[in-house]
Amino acid sequence: MLRRKTQAETNRLNHHIIELLFRQTTRFFAIFVFLLLAAVMTSLVFGSWDSFSTFGFSFLWHNDWNPVQESYGAIIPIVGTLITSFLALIIAVPISFGIAIFLTELAPEWLRRPVGTAIEMLAAIPSIIYGMWGLFIFVPLFQEHIQPSLIEWFGDLPVFSYLFSGAPFGIGLFTAGLVLAIMIIPFIAAVMRDVFTIVPAILKESAYGLGSTTWEVMWKVVLPYTKTGVVGGIMLGLGRALGETMAVTFVIGNAFHLPESLFSPSTSIASAIANEFNEASGLQKSALMELGLILFLITTVVLSISRLLIMRIEKKEGRK
């Protein structure tokens, strides 16, 4: 009897120790995330301190990048990053929405799995493959056919004459934005497909029963029900586009001058760092570190805005 009681107390103590160890371990893992973010932020701040102390906040809008004279500014990479990322979103979001509608509402059962698998495979392709594909396929195609046609069609229109003008190099912001769009389509489409499938069938069946078309059901029933998930998927794609390096480096042109049109060669923050960091030293290396810090802050701001937008949508839905 005494031995059985002692054994029970020992088992209870062992369970308590295991539970305590489990709780502390998971707590450490959670804290480790914040420590990792703090470490990245600290290293970027210390690495960019020389550049910040030399140029101050003028680094943000200065458009010169001259290693010989040690004069650096971030506005050109910032503009290139934002233009290519938002251009990619403009192209990718409608296509992703169409793919998600097809997979959830229109595709026959035998076709849904192969198409879904193909989307997942596209998401798994390394970015350097997209970059090589863009350089050897898109660039000649754009240079010889697409860009000359766009210049001919839109060159005389008031607004489009600025967007589609200049020499048809093939490489440039437009090509980089298109390659980025192809890269982020699988991510956005997969998220939209998943959130569309959680809509209760009775809502869609009721709408169809009232005579609604597929477009009306998606626009007035499915999309309002899944707004939060759709916004999250779009922001996931934007975050992917902002930080993309290799694919953009292949096709953007890597030129440090402000773009005159969408066809102009330019550069992005990630491309500038990838091209120059290995050979940089002194103030140039510090300027590249500050570019990295700016990219870190941009992605943080985008993530924060997306979270606030999602919270606002959820709060508004809660009032209904």
Swiss-Prot record:
UniProt cross-references to PROSITE patterns, sorted A to Z: ABC_TM1
MF annotations from Gene Ontology: phosphate transmembrane transporter activity
Lyase as UniProt keyword: no
Stretches of the chain found on the membrane's Cytoplasmic side: 1-27, 104-114, 192-229, 311-320
Gene3D superfamilies assigned to the protein according to its UniProt record, in alphabetical order: MetI-like
Gene Ontology annotations for the cellular component aspect, listed alphabetically: plasma membrane
Membrane topology: Multi-pass membrane protein
Periplasmic side: 51-80, 138-168, 253-287
UniProt KW keywords: Cell inner membrane, Cell membrane, Membrane, Phosphate transport, Transmembrane, Transmembrane helix, Transport
Membrane spanning residue stretches: 28-50, 81-103, 115-137, 169-191, 230-252, 288-310
Chief localization: membrane
GO biological process entries: phosphate ion transport
Residue span(s) of domain ABC transmembrane type-1: 78-306
Subcellular location: Cell inner membrane
Function text: Part of the binding-protein-dependent transport system for phosphate; probably responsible for the translocation of the substrate across the membrane.
Protein family membership: Belongs to the binding-protein-dependent transport system permease family. CysTW subfamily.
Protein name: Phosphate transport system permease protein PstC
Source species: Pasteurella multocida (strain Pm70)
Gene name, Swiss-Prot/TrEMBL: pstC
